[in-house]
């Protein structure tokens, strides 16, 4: 069985033609799925019965099964199961005047960040385009009349290690015939795969979305301890490619910095971060993320006073920054936590 959501519009037109259907039928199906969020061929009233029966023989819509939905005042965490039995998570974040969806791009992760619950179980596989898009569709269907405005690839996995499937998902998200989201409303968060960031810079689809980079340390040694990936993607190489990254007008690259007590949260660390950014401060903004405690990880969140001291140093150098406390702490909202809890229960 194929999934409609694995195809761009042009790909679906070609596939429909192979099945003996007129190409414009693909546009009709796209309209039902991405404008009305209808995922049942029987409800697509502008398709004849013969066409609906043919499509039902070949296509389905949902590669994911919703296992759980856990709600907190500021977020809703969803657990999904894939057809081959893997568990992934998605978080709907309630902002003041809109909703942001945090999607996963892989089952587990190979980057191995020592402060991340997703890394505990290793990488199982990439998610397909359909599995990425289905996270959006099922959450939007659950949401009803209110609409998801922003999408951030900040869930499980390294998006740039699943480049082709993530790219196609982004293409569907920004297509006028697809979800028609603004490119300014989509963010790709990466641990810093230098070659793939260079690829993004040359990609007509990907270079238009927002780029966020998980930095987390201001020295190569410390970054290697926290993020093993950096052994082959050095801090020096990363900052060089970021400083030369072509940005759309009025955009900045977000440097994500998880603050961990006694590890990377001192005023001296902040001074070194400011020095790392140097004269390129108008190109970057810093997202300070206090570590979200996890019983499976050996780290602690810094005191609020230490967080404020760190922030004050960055302001001193004129570096735009903000503190983001994890949404959904009550529902194990940090990356991988609810999934890890579920997997542990399954093993008991």
From Swiss-Prot:
<feature type="binding site">
    <location>
        <position position="116"/>
    </location>
    <ligand>
        <name>[4Fe-4S] cluster</name>
    </ligand>
</feature>
<comment type="function">
    <text>Specifically methylates position 2 of adenine 2503 in 23S rRNA and position 2 of adenine 37 in tRNAs.</text>
</comment>
<keyword id="KW-0489">Methyltransferase</keyword>
<keyword id="KW-0963">Cytoplasm</keyword>
<dbReference type="InterPro" id="IPR027492">
    <property type="entry name" value="RNA_MTrfase_RlmN"/>
</dbReference>
<dbReference type="GO" id="GO:0070040">
    <property type="term" value="F:rRNA (adenine(2503)-C2-)-methyltransferase activity"/>
</dbReference>
<feature type="binding site">
    <location>
        <begin position="157"/>
        <end position="158"/>
    </location>
    <ligand>
        <name>S-adenosyl-L-methionine</name>
    </ligand>
</feature>
<protein>
    <recommendedName>
        <fullName>Probable dual-specificity RNA methyltransferase RlmN</fullName>
        <ecNumber>2.1.1.192</ecNumber>
    </recommendedName>
</protein>
<feature type="binding site">
    <location>
        <position position="292"/>
    </location>
    <ligand>
        <name>S-adenosyl-L-methionine</name>
    </ligand>
</feature>
<feature type="disulfide bond" description="(transient)">
    <location>
        <begin position="102"/>
        <end position="335"/>
    </location>
</feature>
<feature type="active site" description="Proton acceptor">
    <location>
        <position position="89"/>
    </location>
</feature>
<feature type="domain" description="Radical SAM core">
    <location>
        <begin position="95"/>
        <end position="330"/>
    </location>
</feature>
<dbReference type="InterPro" id="IPR040072">
    <property type="entry name" value="Methyltransferase_A"/>
</dbReference>
<dbReference type="GO" id="GO:0002935">
    <property type="term" value="F:tRNA (adenine(37)-C2)-methyltransferase activity"/>
</dbReference>
<dbReference type="GO" id="GO:0051539">
    <property type="term" value="F:4 iron, 4 sulfur cluster binding"/>
</dbReference>
<keyword id="KW-0479">Metal-binding</keyword>
<keyword id="KW-0698">rRNA processing</keyword>
<dbReference type="Pfam" id="PF21016">
    <property type="entry name" value="RlmN_N"/>
</dbReference>
<dbReference type="GO" id="GO:0005737">
    <property type="term" value="C:cytoplasm"/>
</dbReference>
<keyword id="KW-0004">4Fe-4S</keyword>
<feature type="active site" description="S-methylcysteine intermediate">
    <location>
        <position position="335"/>
    </location>
</feature>
<dbReference type="GO" id="GO:0070475">
    <property type="term" value="P:rRNA base methylation"/>
</dbReference>
<keyword id="KW-0408">Iron</keyword>
<keyword id="KW-0819">tRNA processing</keyword>
<keyword id="KW-0808">Transferase</keyword>
<dbReference type="GO" id="GO:0046872">
    <property type="term" value="F:metal ion binding"/>
</dbReference>
<dbReference type="GO" id="GO:0019843">
    <property type="term" value="F:rRNA binding"/>
</dbReference>
<comment type="similarity">
    <text>Belongs to the radical SAM superfamily. RlmN family.</text>
</comment>
<dbReference type="InterPro" id="IPR007197">
    <property type="entry name" value="rSAM"/>
</dbReference>
<dbReference type="InterPro" id="IPR004383">
    <property type="entry name" value="rRNA_lsu_MTrfase_RlmN/Cfr"/>
</dbReference>
<feature type="binding site">
    <location>
        <position position="109"/>
    </location>
    <ligand>
        <name>[4Fe-4S] cluster</name>
    </ligand>
</feature>
<feature type="binding site">
    <location>
        <begin position="214"/>
        <end position="216"/>
    </location>
    <ligand>
        <name>S-adenosyl-L-methionine</name>
    </ligand>
</feature>
<dbReference type="GO" id="GO:0030488">
    <property type="term" value="P:tRNA methylation"/>
</dbReference>
<keyword id="KW-0411">Iron-sulfur</keyword>
<keyword id="KW-1015">Disulfide bond</keyword>
<dbReference type="Pfam" id="PF04055">
    <property type="entry name" value="Radical_SAM"/>
</dbReference>
<dbReference type="GO" id="GO:0000049">
    <property type="term" value="F:tRNA binding"/>
</dbReference>
<feature type="binding site">
    <location>
        <position position="113"/>
    </location>
    <ligand>
        <name>[4Fe-4S] cluster</name>
    </ligand>
</feature>
<dbReference type="InterPro" id="IPR013785">
    <property type="entry name" value="Aldolase_TIM"/>
</dbReference>
<feature type="binding site">
    <location>
        <position position="189"/>
    </location>
    <ligand>
        <name>S-adenosyl-L-methionine</name>
    </ligand>
</feature>
<keyword id="KW-0949">S-adenosyl-L-methionine</keyword>
<dbReference type="InterPro" id="IPR048641">
    <property type="entry name" value="RlmN_N"/>
</dbReference>
């Amino acid at each position: 069985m194929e999934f409609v959501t694995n195809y761009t519009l042009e790909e679906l037109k070609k596939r429909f033609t192979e099945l003996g259907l007129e190409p414009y039928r693909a546009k009709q199906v796209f309209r039902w799925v991405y404008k009305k969020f209808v995922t049942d061929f029987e409800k697509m009233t502008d398709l004849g019965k013969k066409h609906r029966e043919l499509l039902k023989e070949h296509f389905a819509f949902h590669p994911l099964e919703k296992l759980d939905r856990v709600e907190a005042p500021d977020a809703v965490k969803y657990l999904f199961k894939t057809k081959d039995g893997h568990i992934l998570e998605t978080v709907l974040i309630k902002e003041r005047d809109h909703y942001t969806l945090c999607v996963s791009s892989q089952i587990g992760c190979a980057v191995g960040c020592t402060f991340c619950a997703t890394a505990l179980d290793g990488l199982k596989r990439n998610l397909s385009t359909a599995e990425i898009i289905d996270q959006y569709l099922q959450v939007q269907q659950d949401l009803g009349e209110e609409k998801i405005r922003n999408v951030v690839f900040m869930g499980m996995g390294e998006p740039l290690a699943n480049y082709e499937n993530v790219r196609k998902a982004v293409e569907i998200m920004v297509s006028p015939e697809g979800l028609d989201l603004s490119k300014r409303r989509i963010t790709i968060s990466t641990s810093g795969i230098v070659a793939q960031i260079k690829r993004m810079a040359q990609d007509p689809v990907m270079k238009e979305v927002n780029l966020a980079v998980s930095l987390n340390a201001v020295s190569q040694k410390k970054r290697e301890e926290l993020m093993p990936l950096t052994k082959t993607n050095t801090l020096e190489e990363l900052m060089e490619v970021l400083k030369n990254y072509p940005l759309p007008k009025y955009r900045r690259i977000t440097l994500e910095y998880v603050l961990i007590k006694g590890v990377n949260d001192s005023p001296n660390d902040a001074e070194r971060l400011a020095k790392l950014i140097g004269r390129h401060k108008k190109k970057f903004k810093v997202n300070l993320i206090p570590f979200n405690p996890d019983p499976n990880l050996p780290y602690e969140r810094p005191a609020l006073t230490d967080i404020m001291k760190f922030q004050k140093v960055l302001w001193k150098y004129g570096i735009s920054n903000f503190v983001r406390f994890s949404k959904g702490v009550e529902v194990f909202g940090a990356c991988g936590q609810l999934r890890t809890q579920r997997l542990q229960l399954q093993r008991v």
